[in-house]
Amino acid sequence: MGELPAALYDTLVQAARSYFSAAIPDGRYVAWVAELHERPGEIVGGAGLQLRDLLPRPHPAGQRLMRGPQGLILNVFTERRWRRQGIAAGLMEELLRWTRAHGIESIVLHASGEGRPLYERLGFAPTNEMRYHGKA
């Protein structure tokens, strides 16, 4: 993700608050946080999952249809001084456990170079996704 121009910061914060105030209560966004056991309330990491409705679609193995929402993993982070201690892995394992319990079969994410090895260890594979950023 690139740098956000200062002029857009307040607009983004307001738009995000508006989105989350609706999406969290209605279940379209679920989040996990990691906090220090010895200092409750001190958040050292987090991960989010946005649920998006999709049409029924063929399963990659081709033998059946997949139904239900697709999960888009967002906002996975660990505070710098707490990295390389398994926090992101623990958050992701819990997030994936939740998706299995809720029957969500299709999960995507956009990996940073630093996060890619973790996601590959968890079973994520690169795809051929492309993007178009049209003119507004």
Where are these regions (language model features)?
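Conserved GNAT-fold acetyl-CoA-binding loop/helix
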Residues: 1-19
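Short loop/turn motifs at secondary-structure junctions and domain boundaries
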Residues: 21-27
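Conserved acyl-donor/pantetheine-binding loop and adjacent beta-alpha core of acyl/acetyltransferases
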Residues: 28, 38-75, 80-83
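Hydrophobic beta-strand residues of extracellular immunoglobulin-like
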Residues: 30-33
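Conserved catalytic-core motifs of GNAT/GCN5-like acyltransferases
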Residues: 54-60, 108-116, 120, 125-136
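Conserved acetyl-CoA pyrophosphate-binding loop and the N-cap/start of the following alpha-helix
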Residues: 82-94
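Conserved GNAT acetyl-CoA-binding A-motif
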Residues: 92, 99-111
